[in-house]
Regions:
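Active-site C-terminal subdomain of aminotransferase-like
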Residues: 359-431
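Terminal substrate-recognition subdomain of acyl/acetyltransferases
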Residues: 1-30, 40-46, 57, 97, ...
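Conserved acyl-donor/pantetheine-binding loop and adjacent beta-alpha core of acyl/acetyltransferases
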Residues: 61-104, 159
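Conserved PLP-dependent catalytic core of the aminotransferase class-I/II
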Residues: 213-224, 414-440
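Conserved C-terminal alpha-helix-loop-beta "cap" of PLP-dependent enzymes
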Residues: 442-502
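N-terminal "arm"/small-domain region of PLP-dependent enzymes with the aminotransferase-like
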Residues: 177-205
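Active-site phosphate-binding strand-loop segment of PLP-dependent enzymes
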Residues: 287-337
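Conserved beta-loop-alpha segment that forms the PLP phosphate-binding cup at the N-terminus of a helix
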Residues: 224-254, 262-266
């Protein structure tokens, strides 16, 4: 297996110095020989090295540097003189592209190209320049580089100033390289089947049949009486839920938060001018039902709002326990089940209102939101029409509902109840991988695993991306806490798991954590 990472250990830096010597002293006579057979680059402290491995053997490298002057500036003058102005906003230099002689194959080239482009793109560079040797001109062109200035150097070591622009990457290389990518995102979900129903009207009888079938399936999975299907995101679903609380003027509520999405609910509730208190727990810790019972016992609260599956930490809050408290103290329980709905079987029977979406565990295209209720909502003239739950419960389809979304959801729902077992098995398989012992100590649900990275693994997120393994860690709330998330809901999970397991197996032999 060939795989790439950002160099970070002393052993890697020594291997880089050896390869640097073999390539740029012995093979290409740029520097004087020495007895150590090591060549440390003059910009070593400023370089970021991407290295390529064959299992655990370092076989190739490339260096990035964005501090001026570039070495190519010293050869031809400032590169901006030769490049179009629009590509000069953020330029980096790529140097020291080297691969051991025995490994100069198309597979290694492709792996380095993928890693090089991913790194440059993620860092926001508009162009990457390189001094390419004339003997490897074909190789550089295969990687997307184009000559932009006359050749320079000596007869024995002649170089071509070459550039790879962000525009070339986006319009030529990105799609080709992304074919080998696997994602472990908790949404959106990759679609492998052709999207149909592109010409079906939402006013047709055929559409109505699909709509009713989807409604019944959702109601069966949720064990509720009513569901509104809305074009929108989970945020829209929660707006509709909160709008009901505001329109009904139910009184004071209690909002429970122990993560990012509980906090978002609280902020939305503030915008609706709802009257409520907050029970705030540390991220990743579950709520103490005894303490909540003491609060409800006062009789001060008429409703309670909680996130069932707190995606930011992978915490599954105790829905059964909270439901029992709500019933006992006659409090209306409202639940954000966006992350858990479709991931495991549970009942929303005792929930006054609950929300879910199409593009999470269910595995359908993102774009449809669901609001479940145990009652038939009354029209609320004070609410915006789009956020009035009653409009979605009158039997008619009040607003345009794309058939492509509904048809895709219908097909995804046909996987139930078998999908529950599939996700559980995937979840258990994921737990066996290296580094999963770093998962947060919390109550889990079979949708995603959250690990907290020690300093030694600070590059793991980008290192996985360099190899086409895309995991969830870009959100600010995840970056701030060093969280990395692996979800099990993508259609090609089994194939992705094999590659992830293989890479992590070698990775842990290089990086101790």
């Amino acid at each position: 297996m060939y795989w790439c990472k950002i160099a970070q250990t002393n052993e890697e830096y020594e291997a880089i110095a050896r390869l640097n010597y073999e390539t740029f002293v012995e093979e290409i006579p740029q520097h004087e020989p020495n007895t150590q057979r090591l060549k440390i680059d003059r910009f070593h402290q400023e370089n970021t090295y991407i290295v390529v491995y064959k299992k655990t053997e370092l076989i190739g490298m490339v260096a990035f540097r964005d501090q001026r002057p570039f070495s190519i500036d010293e050869k031809i003058g400032k590169v901006e003189r030769f490049l179009p102005k629009e590509v000069c906003d953020k330029v980096c230099e790529i140097r020291l592209l080297a691969v051991k002689k025995n490994y100069r194959t198309g597979r290694v080239l492709l792996k380095l190209t993928q890693a090089l482009n991913t790194f440059a793109y993620e860092k926001g560079y508009t162009a990457a320049v390189i001094s390419g040797t004339t003997r490897e001109e074909k190789l550089y062109k295969q990687m997307g580089f184009q000559q932009f200035a006359p050749a320079v150097g000596t007869k024995n070591a002649q170089f071509l100033p070459m550039v790879l622009t962000r525009n070339v990457f986006e319009h030529d290389l990105q799609r080709r390289l992304a074919k080998d990518d696997y994602t472990f995102y908790p949404g959106p979900v990759k679609q492998v089947e052709t999207i149909g129903y592109t010409n079906l009207s939402h006013r047709s009888l055929s559409f109505k049949a699909i709509y009713e079938r989807v409604q019944q399936k959702l109601l069966h999975l949720a064990n509720t009486k009513h569901v509104g299907i809305i074009v929108g995101t989970g945020t829209v679903a929660n707006e509709v839920m909160l709008a009901q609380l505001q329109a009904q003027q139910l009184g004071k509520g209690l909002i429970l938060t122990n993560g990012e999405f509980g906090e978002r609910l609280r902020k939305q509730a503030v915008r609706w001018s709802l009257d409520f208190d907050v029970v705030e727990q540390e991220w990743g810790t579950i709520f103490d039902c005894e303490k909540i019972a003491l609060l409800l016992k006062t009789g001060a609260y008429q409703w309670m709002l909680v996130v069932h599956g707190e995606t930011s930490t992978g915490t599954c809050n105790d829905l059964d326990g909270l439901s029992q408290l709500a019933k006992y103290y006659k409090v209306k329980l409202c639940v954000d089940s966006i992350s858990t709905f479709g991931a495991m079987p549970f009942s929303l029977q005792d929930c006054y209102l609950a929300t879910a979406v199409s593009g999470k565990a269910i595995g359908a295209v993102s774009g449809l939101a669901f609001v479940f209720s145990q009652y038939l909502a009354q029209s609320a003239p004070t609410l915006p029409a789009y956020l009035d739950l009653a409009n979605y419960q009158q039997g008619a389809i009040p607003f345009t509902l794309p058939a492509v979304l509904l048809g895709n959801l219908d097909e995804s729902l046909q996987a139930y109840p078998v999908r529950y077992e599939q996700l559980q098995q995937r979840f258990e398989a994921l737990l066996q991988l290296p580094y999963m012992h770093l998962q947060l100590p919390t109550t889990r649900y079979p949708m995603l695993i959250t690990i907290q990275l020690p300093n030694a693994l600070s590059n793991l997120h980008i290192d996985l991306a360099l190899n086409g393994l895309l995991v969830h860690g870009d959100s600010p709330y995840l970056r701030e806490r060093g969280f990395l998330q692996f979800a099990v809901i993508q259609p090609d999970f089994e194939e992705a798991l094999v590659r992830l397991n293989e890479m992590l197996h070698y990775y842990e032999q290089i990086i101790e954590a």
